[in-house]
Amino acid sequence: MKILICEDNQLAAKAMSVVIEREGYDPVTVGDGNKAIEALQKTDFDLAIVDIHMPYHSGLEVVRFLRTELKKQTPVLIVSAFSDPQIQRQAGEMKVSGYITKPFDPADLLRKIRVAVAVV
């Protein structure tokens, strides 16, 4: 399973990538919203994990592009250092599969990945 990780914090991106790779998944990591959009245009991912605050385009802007411009219903998990109810509401309106608060628990991340891809 190919998973896009869109995270500008290199330490968090590496941590997620290691956890995901250990489960046998294929992570692809990008560090900003522009690169996330480019990757989504070029590759059909099974899941995208998108940080809410990134350079160039926010996580919600990336999800909006995925849904409206690319017309894809790829499962998405939003990642944030803050548990913001407004962002969670907006993410829910865009049919986001889940919300992960940093620092993340590896077991919780894997559980949310399994739930997100099982829905498809």
Task: Please give the residue ranges for each predicted region.
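Conserved acidic carboxylate
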Residues: E7
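Two-component/phosphorelay signaling modules centered on CheY-like receiver
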Residues: Q10-V28, M94
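The feature encodes the CheY-like receiver
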Residues: P55, D84, K102
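C-terminal output helix
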Residues: Q86, F104-I113
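Active-site beta3 strand of CheY-like receiver
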Residues: T43-I49
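Acidic catalytic/metal-coordinating carboxylates
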Residues: D32, S58-V62
